[in-house]
Structures are given as structure tokens and as C-alpha cells.
């Protein structure tokens, strides 16, 4: 199953990942009553949420024990009660917080490694929801109504209270049981207006030494990919569904200098959605997930001379 991960943060000093899943409910006080009555809170809570969140909450407890996992349950515009589930060793430990108390904890954890350069949360998109990803989830789960979820972005901004975020979201995340492999999908919206999805690439705006450099995002994704020992797919798309979508499987990356090697694929929007639907229910034993598609390998020699070679990036794929 495929779903988004709301927030992941890696601490260099602790060598540890912190994961946050935000679930907005209609009545937080009814959940508080379940806690007080010592009923089967976890089972009853899962019944009250949508299928995408249920799938996430089924997988999160099974992730590596070195990941500190938090489920934050809140009600919009209610600040006197937030329920946080700390998950470890297969146990769900609930704690009650006020918004202020949770914000103090959240900001302290966000700054655990001290001051580092990082883009502010929400800079990439002006609204809180990622409509492209939500539309994909609507198709994958065959929902009657369009899926709507801001992945906790609004409450995260409030919790940080202006601090620069050290965390990031994973647009789509998957564990494939037949291959025992994790997949990370990151969607990169092409808003340049002058470069096609096929020629778009993070090296055009990362590892540039400019103020708007976005390398931290890709370093964080690369660390997560290595931690999970999985695959990382970067998907370049635009608002024009008639334009081909570009997928880059990141094979190797240097935190200091950028991309070292990748395999690149291109396909139409409709074929991309069909491929994702196949991935959503993948049961094959091999992990050649894109074996049906033509690809081009860009190696260390290509990326070592990126300034000169970028004009040739994407050649061989037709717009």
C-alpha cells in the first residue's frame, strides 16, 4: 500500500529518525473518554479514521525500533487537548498535551542538532494541501470523493511558531512485503515555464551555493532512503497532464556535491498512474519495478561535469 508520511526528521547527534503522523478528528474529547475508560483505544480509534490513515497506522508500529514514532491526534481549533501516542516495542503509550506544551516539545526536538540551514516549511507550495498527491491517492484507493489531507502542515507550522523546520514530509511511502523493500516517492513540481519535465532536475537548483539552494531536501531524502535500504524515486511533473512525467531513480548521491548516478524514465501521465496502481498492489518477487520501461543511466562522469553536460540531460526522451 502507498501513502504519505507527514513528517520525518533525522538527528545527526542522535543518529536517529523521528516520525510524526498527524490525524485530525471531529471530537477529541470522545477519544479522551475512551482513554479514561481504558477501552481498546487503538482498535476503536482506527475504526474512526479514513482508509489511507488506517494503512499508515498499520505499518508505522512495524518500522525499525530506532525510529521514534509519534501519532498526534488533534481537533481543529482546540488547543486545550491533544493526544499523542508514543509507539515503541509494539506498545501504544498515550499522553495528553495542551497545544503550548506540545509546541515546546516539538520545537525542542526540531532544534535537537542546533542551528542548520534549512528551507522553511511550506515554502515550496503556497497552500497547505498537495493537490497533485491527493488526486493520486484518490485514484489509488478508488475513493468516491477527492481525498483531502494537509498531512499536518497547518498544525506543524503553528507548533514550530516561526522556527525553521528540520523535518520533511515523504510525499508517498510504501513497504512491499513480497520484496521486503521500502519505496520513497518525491514529487517535484516543474513551475519554470521554460524547461520540460524531461529536462528538469534537482541539480539545476541545488548544490548551487545560492540562498535559495534546496540541497537539504534531497540530502534528507537520501538519508531516509539509505536508512530504509530502499529505493528513492524523484518524479518531475507539471499542471499540464499532456506533458510527459519524468522519474529519476537515485542510485548514488554525495551530500557535499550532489547527484552521482541515477536511472531516468519517462512516461505519460495516464501510464504513470497505471504504474502506480500496479505498485500499490505489487506482489511480484523481483524488485525491478520499472523493468517495462526504457531508461537511460546517468553516471558519475556525467554528473561530475554537470555544468557542461546538463544541456544533454533528457536527450533521447521525446516531449
What are these regions (language model features)?
Residues 50-89, 219-252:
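Nucleic-acid nuclease catalytic cores
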Residues 244-288:
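Polybasic, proline/glycine-rich intrinsically disordered low-complexity segments
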Amino acid at each position: 500500500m502507498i501513502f504519505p508520511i507527514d513528517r520525518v526528521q533525522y538527528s545527526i547527534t542522535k543518529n536517529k529518525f523521528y516520525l510524526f503522523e498527524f490525524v485530525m478528528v471531529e471530537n477529541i474529547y470522545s477519544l479522551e473518554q475512551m482513554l479514561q475508560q481504558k477501552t481498546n483505544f487503538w482498535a476503536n480509534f482506527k475504526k474512526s479514521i479514513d482508509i489511507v490513515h488506517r494503512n499508515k497506522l498499520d505499518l508505522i508500529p512495524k518500522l525499525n525500533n530506532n525510529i521514534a514514532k509519534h501519532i498526534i491526534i488533534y481537533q481543529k481549533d482546540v488547543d486545550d487537548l491533544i493526544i499523542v501516542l508514543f509507539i515503541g516495542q509494539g506498545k501504544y503509550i498515550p499522553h495528553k498535551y495542551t497545544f503550548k506544551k506540545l509546541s515546546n516539545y516539538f520545537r525542542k526536538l526540531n532544534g535537537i542538532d542546533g542551528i542548520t540551514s534549512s528551507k522553511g516549511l511550506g515554502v515550496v507550495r503556497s497552500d497547505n494541501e498537495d493537490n497533485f498527491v491527493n488526486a493520486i491517492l484518490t485514484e489509488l484507493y478508488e475513493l468516491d470523493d477527492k481525498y483531502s489531507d494537509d498531512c499536518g502542515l497547518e498544525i506543524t507550522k503553528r507548533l514550530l511558531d516561526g522556527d525553521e523546520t528540520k523535518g520533511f514530509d515523504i510525499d508517498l511511502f510504501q513497504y512491499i512485503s513480497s520484496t521486503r523493500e521500502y519505496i520513497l516517492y518525491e514529487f517535484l513540481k516543474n513551475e519554470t515555464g521554460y524547461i520540460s519535465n524531461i529536462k528538469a532536475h534537482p541539480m539545476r537548483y541545488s548544490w548551487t551555493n545560492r540562498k535559495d539552494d534546496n540541497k537539504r531536501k534531497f540530502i534528507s531524502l537520501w538519508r531516509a532512503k539509505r536508512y530504509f535500504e530502499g529505493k528513492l524515486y524523484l518524479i518531475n511533473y507539471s499542471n499540464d497532464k499532456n506533458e510527459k512525467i519524468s522519474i529519476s531513480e537515485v542510485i548514488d548521491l554525495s551530500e557535499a556535491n550532489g547527484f552521482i548516478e541515477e536511472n531516468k524514465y519517462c512516461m505519460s501521465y495516464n501510464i504513470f498512474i497505471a504504474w502506480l496502481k500496479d505498485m500499490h498492489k505489487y506482489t511480484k518477487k523481483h524488485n525491478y519495478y520499472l523493468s517495462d520501461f526504457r531508461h537511460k543511466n546517468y553516471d558519475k562522469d556525467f554528473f561530475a561535469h554537470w555544468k557542461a553536460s546538463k544541456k544533454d540531460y533528457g536527450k533521447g526522451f521525446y516531449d
